[in-house]
Curated annotation (Swiss-Prot):
It comes from Bacillus cereus (strain ATCC 10987 / NRS 248). InterPro entries: FAD/NAD-bd_sf, GIDA_C_N, MnmG, MnmG-rel, MnmG-rel_CS, MnmG_C, MnmG_C_subdom, MnmG_C_subdom_sf. One of its GO terms (molecular function) is flavin adenine dinucleotide binding. The gene is mnmG. One of its GO terms (biological process) is tRNA methylation. Homodimer. Heterotetramer of two MnmE and two MnmG subunits. This is tRNA uridine 5-carboxymethylaminomethyl modification enzyme MnmG.
């Protein structure tokens, strides 16, 4: 027998990385919010790698922070090591990566949630949604509690009909042997949602005391203070190194001999795995010409001896995992503390979502994270933030927020999901962003802080600091454009010392900075600023001046794209009435129901001829209403 357990503006199902961002965003925007999770001890748990960031993903964390989300602040307080990657490359691909103390990360984020006004955290398993007349009105838990709500966000991760697989062992489970969610998955199918089966995996954990680190290569953090959050002022400098080793020919022989026992190759696993995070079995089979593969030994925290064996994700049986570990240099006498495993789970087909992450089938129902077919904590957190923002906007009667591909990697991620869908766990890569020179690690605040402030997630004090930073950047760029540096002896000497060509005539400081060998520090030595500027300001000045031509070209591409995005397609357009459309294009357009011609042009199977036909149809005003509306 059910009972009325309360009423909320927003209910979030799940408290992983997507759920935490969704719940915090909704509550901070003023919505009365409830977060329901199967196990309170697993809030913000890291079931796989103990790290945050990396290529593209690190930029997402900066974007989350720029919008007012929590992930960046939380990892800044709880990491054991931080490194800037790709420092030898251009600014578009630089990315920050932090090694997390996974237990501190959990505890700190749970504490933040517990102390947030408007936010209630409760342990309970949701089994059904309350749906009336095509609208989600709330949820029903296993215990019979009925919670009503204006909006609901599902962030169930890999728990939906989760199954752990290791060799020929297979059992119903969520990650890390947690209770899975079976009934909710079945209920979503009853509601008419198309589900797919995906798979991911995790490597074994080993005891640090049994590793011979003398046979490995140290991987220290950066000496320079680093942070994901634009608010962080206190930096952790007491860092713990990671270690690099490699598989051996003996490792590969052992894997080859036991491939028939791997769930990946025995037919036990039916779900599709992540292309960019293959198991060690996959790597050995697909790249059999390589004599070895990198293995990173990553501590899981400051107060544990558990070490994550990055690069050794596997579904081999436990006995093979033990033997395999001991074929790796430095791990000859290692003790395994946890076995690696594969996990299969249900995900929804993401083309069933609007760009707001609201489902098309049921109004006021949003989904975010791995349920949408993505992989990774950062991708989940970015979606969770946007779903939480939009659920709150809906509950408060405000306009929802959609980030474009030119605005953020989060925008690229969501657009790819809802427009193209995915047939494997989706991982964000820099190559997926056509405007990546505009979507950099360094300028996330310049791109998104105003949006965060407008929706109420960025406080006035922070916004004031941000506007001051913007002003300083513009003033310094103007100063450098107005100063002429003459070929004085000290100028020529500096230029010679850094391998540049001497000046023949006077040159604007900004033009001199455009030279590849010149940095802002060099210019500052020649024409110092009277105002003390932060590293963040001078970095922006240098990048914006050096890459001005390329940035301008990207902005022109964005303007062309925006013309297509501005051509809106009515939600109730009847594609069957457009007789000239190719049959594949018609079906794809009916499935995705794009909101603009720009979005339609990105759908696989819709070619330029179809877009031309669609444009003519819309511009002539021949919009046929759906007969039952």
């Amino acid at each position: 027998m059910g009972y009325n357990a309360g009423s909320y503006d927003v209910i979030v199902i799940g408290a992983g990385h997507a759920g935490c961002e969704a719940g915090l965003a909704a509550a901070r925007m003023g919505s009365k919010t409830l977060m329901l999770t199967i196990n309170l001890d697993m809030v913000a748990f890291m079931p796989c790698n103990p790290s945050v960031g990396g290529p593209a993903k690190g930029i997402v964390v900066r974007e989350i922070d720029a919008l007012g989300g929590e992930m960046g602040r939380n990892i800044d307080k709880t990491h054991i090591q931080m490194r800037m990657l790709n420092t030898g490359k251009g600014p578009a691909v630089r990315a920050l990566r932090a090694q997390a103390d996974k237990f501190s990360y959990q505890h700190e984020l749970k504490k933040t949630i517990e102390e947030t006004p408007n936010l209630t955290l409760f342990q309970g398993m949701v089994e059904r949604l309350i749906v009336e007349d095509g609208e989600c009105k709330g949820v029903i838990t296993q215990a019979g509690a009925e919670y009503t709500a204006k909006t609901v966000v599902i962030t169930t991760g890999t728990f939906l009909r989760g199954e752990i697989i290791m060799g020929d062992l297979k059992y119903s489970s969520g990650p890390n042997n947690q209770q899975p969610s079976i009934t909710l998955s079945e209920h979503l199918e009853e509601l008419g949602f198309d589900l797919v089966r995906f798979k991911t995996g995790t490597p074994p954990r080993v005891n640090s005391n049994t590793i011979d680190y003398s046979k490995t290569e140290i991987q220290p953090g950066d000496d320079k203070p680093r942070a994901f959050s634009f608010e962080t002022t206190k930096f952790i400098m007491d860092q713990i190194p990671c270690w690099l080793t490699y598989t051996s020919t003996e490792t590969h022989r052992l894997i080859d001999e036991n491939l028939h026992r791997s769930a990946m190759y025995s037919g036990m696993i039916k779900g599709t795995g992540p292309r960019y995070c293959p198991s060690i079995e996959d790597k050995v089979v697909r790249f059999n010409d390589k004599p070895r593969h990198q293995i990173f030994l990553e501590p899981e925290g400051r107060n544990t001896q558990e070490v994550y064996v990055q690069g050794l994700s596997t579904s081999l049986p436990e006995d093979v995992q033990r033997d395999m570990l001991r074929t790796i240099p430095g791990l000859e006498n290692v003790e395994m503390m946890r076995t690696g495993y594969a996990i299969e789970y249900d995900a929804i087909v993401p083309t069933q979502l609007w760009p707001t992450l609201e489902t098309k089938k049921i109004k006021n129902l949003y989904t975010a994270g791995q349920i949408n077919g993505t992989s990774g904590y950062e991708e989940a957190a970015g979606q969770g933030l946007m779903a939480g923002i939009n659920a709150a906007c809906r509950s408060l009667g405000k306009k929802e927020v959609i980030l474009g591909r030119e605005d953020a990697y989060i925008g690229v991620l969501i657009d790819d999901l809802v427009t193209k869908g995915t047939n494997e766990p989706y991982r964000l890569l820099t190559s997926r962003a056509e405007y990546r020179l505009l979507l950099r690690h360094d300028n996330a605040d310049l791109r998104l802080t105003e949006i965060g402030h407008e929706i109420g997630l960025i406080k006035e004090e922070r916004y004031e600091r941000f506007t001051n930073k913007k002003l300083q950047i513009e003033q310094e760029k103007e100063r450098l454009s107005s100063i002429i540096i003459k070929p004085r002896p000290e100028v020529q000497e500096l230029i010679r010392n850094i391998g540049g060509s001497e000046l023949k005539d006077g040159i604007r400081a900004s033009d001199l900075l455009r030279r590849p060998e010149m940095t802002y520090e060099h210019i500052h030595l020649l024409v110092p600023s009277e105002v003390e500027l932060s590293d963040e300001v001078t970095e922006q000045v240098e990048i914006q001046i050096k890459y001005e031509g390329y940035i301008e070209k990207s902005l022109q591409q964005v303007e062309r794209m925006k013309k297509m995005e501005s051509k809106k397609i009515p939600v109730d357009i009847d594609y069957d009435a457009i007789s000239s459309l190719a049959s594949e294009a018609r079906q794809k357009l009916k499935d995705v129901r794009p909101l603009s011609v720009g979005q339609a042009s990105r759908i696989s199977g819709v070619n330029p001829a179809d877009i031309s036909i669609l444009l003519v149809y819309i511009e002539q005003g021949k919009i046929a209403r759906v007969s039952n509306q």
